[in-house]
Design a protein with these regions (language model features):
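C-terminal effector/interaction modules appended to NTPase cores
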Residues: 1-170
Length: 170
């Protein structure tokens, strides 16, 4: 989805977090070679809908949905890539989708949580927790800006259930 700005064939774009290297995560810079919206090819698209973006990238880089959850923007304009994050937390009274009225228990350190940040989903392991905030180490990095909402899910009865949300702090 294009949520902000415009994109045209020939534009230079940056993809973050990018790809994993032996030095960490490296953004990918490439050019837009084609744009498709609906069933038609376009030269330019504006925010407000789903867009297929063709690039000059080797298909091996994008295999197995390895770019899932990545952000695209003009080089140098995207938020930072985070491998650890801190957020203010608001837990729900009851876990969504559980049978009965499953109360949400307080968060615990080292408890795996599923965190959804924009279109990125990753496992977060809490390092420090108190009733108002959480600091977590992420299994996969995310590209996110301060103030962004993060959905927090916990594994209950072998399934992930929404238990609250957080607001990203820097």
């Amino acid at each position: 989805s294009l949520i902000q700005g415009e994109l045209a064939v020939g534009d230079e774009i940056e993809i973050r977090p990018g790809r994993k290297t032996n030095r960490g995560w490296e953004p990918i810079v490439t050019n837009v070679t084609s744009l498709h919206s609906g069933s038609s090819e376009r030269k330019r698209v504006a925010a407000g809908g789903l867009v297929a973006i063709g690039t000059g990238l080797d298909p091996a880089i994008t295999k197995s949905d390895s770019m899932l959850g990545s952000l695209i923007g003009r080089p140098g304009t995207l938020p930072p890539v985070l491998e650890k994050l801190r957020m203010d937390v608001q837990l729900l009274d009851r876990a969504v989708g559980t049978s009965g009225s499953q109360q949400v228990e307080a968060l615990r350190t080292k408890e795996p949580l599923m965190l959804t940040v924009g279109t990125s989903t990753t496992v977060g392991i809490p390092i420090q927790v108190n009733e108002k905030w959480l600091e977590a180490s992420l299994k996969l990095p995310v590209c996110a800006a301060e103030g962004q909402r993060i959905a927090i899910s916990r594994r209950i009865d072998a399934r992930w259930h929404l238990i609250g949300y957080g607001i990203l702090q820097t």
